[in-house]
């Protein structure tokens, strides 16, 4: 249990019926499960690097890493809760839409509109903190039917599953039927059409789909066998299978992208593009009514994301005292 060492004193492992080993495995599993956000967030907010230049991409990338680390450490040491924190898919998607609309409506550069939208996020964050301190958020949670509260987290999970299977792995249901065929990221393709038109991309897509199903099967198998760290082991095995498949069947080096890669954090790019870069002067150009509307919208998205996550992770059930703690 880690008794006699700082881990036990800091996190009350015995009281929470856990061990240092369990926490390490859980931490690694959580990291690998959510690590996609490190690349997805800057890609989403910069149009895969097409908007704002590489400086903005680097700035968002580093900000994502730092914000996730700081948020998770605060949850660990201040709240003593096993929750990892990172940018949410709901908020960042809407943020990208807002930035794009500011560009089209005002003619600002993408970077300036990005920094203007950051002001909206800052205001929304302050409002959200005030609502939490005044326990308004708690009242809102209590007013939501328990069934809806418990359904938010699974709904988010199913959305991510759809994104992962349909967009990344390349699997979708043909005409609403029960059979699945492969597609690329941009649209539906039958296997024969894909093979004829995708060239070298087709074998890679097949390898991706096969690896995904093998990985899922291994996770279920390990869990059925009650092997600790089943999710982590399944992900590691699937990664190894994919890398081996790339080398054997695709005749490519799975680690080629590491050549020439820089491992020095781009603090300069973050300082230039995102660090305290709030363009309050430009808020007037989009109109204060629009600003208020955006703050309210962001606050609602943030609130329901938080409610769904906390309820789902806390396994809050029907008893009234437990519900009030939600």
Task: Label each PLM-derived region with a short phrase.
Residues 21-28, 118, 284-297:
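Select transmembrane alpha-helical segments in multipass membrane proteins
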Residues 25-207:
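Early transmembrane hairpin of solute transport permeases
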Residues 4-17:
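Short, Lys/Arg-rich, polar N-terminal cytosolic tail immediately upstream
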Residues 200-204, 217-271, 299-303, 307:
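Flexible hinge motifs at transmembrane-helix junctions and intramembrane kinks/re-entrant loops
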Residues 183-201, 258-288, 295-301, 308:
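P-loop potassium selectivity filter motif centered on the GYG triad
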Residues 67-72, 213-219:
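Hydrophobic, membrane-inserted alpha-helices
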Residues 317-326:
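Single conserved hydrophobic/aromatic residue that forms the stacking wall/gate
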Residues 89-91, 121-122, 152, 156, ...:
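Hydrophobic mid-bilayer segments of alpha-helices in multi-pass membrane transport proteins
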């Amino acid at each position: 249990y880690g008794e006699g060492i700082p881990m036990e004193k800091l996190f009350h492992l015995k009281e929470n019926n856990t061990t240092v080993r369990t926490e390490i495995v859980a931490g690694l599993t959580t990291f690998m499960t959510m690590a996609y956000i490190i690349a997805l967030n800057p890609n989403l907010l910069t149009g895969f690097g097409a908007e704002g230049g590489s400086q903005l991409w680097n700035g968002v990338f580093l900000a994502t890493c730092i914000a996730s680390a700081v948020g998770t450490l605060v949850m660990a040491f201040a709240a003593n809760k096993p929750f990892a924190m990172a940018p949410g898919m709901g908020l960042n998607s809407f943020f990208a839409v807002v930035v794009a609309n500011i560009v089209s409506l005002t003619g600002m550069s993408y970077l300036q509109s990005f920094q203007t939208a950051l002001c909206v996020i800052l205001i929304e964050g302050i409002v959200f903190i005030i609502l939490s301190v005044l326990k308004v958020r708690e009242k809102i949670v209590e007013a939501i039917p328990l069934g809806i509260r418990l359904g938010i987290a699974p709904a988010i999970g199913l959305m991510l599953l759809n994104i992962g299977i349909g967009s990344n792995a390349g699997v979708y249901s043909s005409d609403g039927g029960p059979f699945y065929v492969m597609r690329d990221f941009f649209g539906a393709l039958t296997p024969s059409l894909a093979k004829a038109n995708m060239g070298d991309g087709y074998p890679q897509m097949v390898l991706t789909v096969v690896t995904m199903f093998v990985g899922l099967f291994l996770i279920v198998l390990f869990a059925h066998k009650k092997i600790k760290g089943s999710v982590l082991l399944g992900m590691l095995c699937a990664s190894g299978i994919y890398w081996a498949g790339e080398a054997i069947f695709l005749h490519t080096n799975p680690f080629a992208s590491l050549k020439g890669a820089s491992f020095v954090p781009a603090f300069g790019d973050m300082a230039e593009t995102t660090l305290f870069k709030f363009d309050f002067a430009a808020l007037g150009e989009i109109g204060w009514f629009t600003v208020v509307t955006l703050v309210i919208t962001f606050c609602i998205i943030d609130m329901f994301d938080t409610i769904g996550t906390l309820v789902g992770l806390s396994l809050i059930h029907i008893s009234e005292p437990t519900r009030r703690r939600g």
